[in-house]
Amino acid sequence: KEKYPTRFYNIGICEQSMMSLSAGLALAGLIPVIHSITPFVTERCFEQIKDDFCYQGVGGNIVSVGSCFDYAGLGCTHHCYSDIAAIKSLPRTQIIYPASEIEFDLLMKQTYNNNRLTYFRLPQKKHSYKFSQDQIKFGKGIKINEGKDITIVAAGPQLENVLKAKTELEKEGISPEVIYIHTIKPLDKDLIIASAKKTGIVLTIEEHNIIGGLADEVARTLEDMEGVRLSRLGVNDRFITDYGTYDEICNSIGLTPEGIIS
């Protein structure tokens, strides 16, 4: 806004108009970046995303904040745990879920002008794991460590809890292999399949409804593999009606190191 004032438009609380306006800019050859709170820029604008962007085959970038229950105390209107499911269902879309500054910076630069509609789901929390620049590639998952007993596939800030759980599991003689996913669509299927062949057990962890999110993508990836067990940890097809902070809601639905271990 300060550096390029002629490239910044505040549309106000008119998210659907904002989406259609941005699609018009894209049709005129520009590259729009559309920003708002997650439920308002995805669920409220779904028809405009479908008809004005995806059906027209134009590219752009949706950057949301306040994913899942980041705005915990504001209730259901500000919660959003089905956005990935909604956007993923549309052709010509890409979904990126970065949980650190370096991921967002590099993945935005890698994808912002590739003629696809890219949805960036930015969480309020972030993990503390330090990635090198060469580890972060669009469409490629990251194997955090080698393991042999179970594959844990994590997305978003829950990587933090997974790494804490990993430490405790190793103390019990269990060797987890941790895979971190920042690109939900397209998913790095080869990495997940290779790990599942080795361990035979896969657990997905996500701040999203287990229907339609990372868990479903992993399940579809593994559907033709015999002898692989899959478990899912996330929002279990329900509304979050508990009142509290982000951490308190995580505790209530098992998105904790203890919940992962159990």
Locations of regions flagged by a protein language model:
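Thiamine diphosphate
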Residues: 1-262
